[in-house]
Swiss-Prot record:
<comment type="function">
    <text>Transfers a methylene group from S-adenosyl-L-methionine to the cis double bond of an unsaturated fatty acid chain resulting in the replacement of the double bond with a methylene bridge.</text>
</comment>
<comment type="similarity">
    <text>Belongs to the CFA/CMAS family.</text>
</comment>
<keyword id="KW-0808">Transferase</keyword>
<dbReference type="Pfam" id="PF02353">
    <property type="entry name" value="CMAS"/>
</dbReference>
<keyword id="KW-0949">S-adenosyl-L-methionine</keyword>
<dbReference type="InterPro" id="IPR029063">
    <property type="entry name" value="SAM-dependent_MTases_sf"/>
</dbReference>
<protein>
    <recommendedName>
        <fullName>Cyclopropane-fatty-acyl-phospholipid synthase</fullName>
        <ecNumber>2.1.1.79</ecNumber>
    </recommendedName>
</protein>
<dbReference type="InterPro" id="IPR050723">
    <property type="entry name" value="CFA/CMAS"/>
</dbReference>
<keyword id="KW-0444">Lipid biosynthesis</keyword>
<dbReference type="GO" id="GO:0008825">
    <property type="term" value="F:cyclopropane-fatty-acyl-phospholipid synthase activity"/>
</dbReference>
<keyword id="KW-0443">Lipid metabolism</keyword>
<dbReference type="GO" id="GO:0005737">
    <property type="term" value="C:cytoplasm"/>
</dbReference>
<feature type="active site">
    <location>
        <position position="61"/>
    </location>
</feature>
<keyword id="KW-0489">Methyltransferase</keyword>
<dbReference type="GO" id="GO:0006629">
    <property type="term" value="P:lipid metabolic process"/>
</dbReference>
<dbReference type="GO" id="GO:0032259">
    <property type="term" value="P:methylation"/>
</dbReference>
<keyword id="KW-0963">Cytoplasm</keyword>
Length: 89
């Protein structure tokens, strides 16, 4: 984090820094649920091996986000906006 701030401070203003990690866990689990609900329609195009691997990928990534082993950050930079940028969540 400090490297990003240090490298950008002479060029940009860091307006916002947001962690989406806990949201991405929920997103991955929603994709997992929708993928498996849609499997009857997808099964003619994808193998059972692909299904197992994709389920493993989605669940492993969701678990890593849940355990906070990985993070997803969005950093908003500007060249300087008078009054700053208001970010709504």
């Amino acid at each position: 984090i400090s490297h990003i701030a240090e490298a950008s401070e002479s060029r940009f203003v860091m307006e916002d820094w947001h962690n989406f990690g806990s949201d991405y866990d929920k997103t991955l689990m929603a994709w997992h649920e929708r993928f498996n609900q849609a499997w009857p329609e997808l099964s003619s195009r994808y193998s059972a091996t692909f299904r197992r691997m994709f389920n493993y990928y989605l669940c492993a990534c969701a678990g890593a986000f849940r355990a906070r082993d990985i993070e997803l950050w969005q950093v908003l930079f500007s060249r300087g906006v008078e009054g700053g940028i208001r970010v709504y969540r």
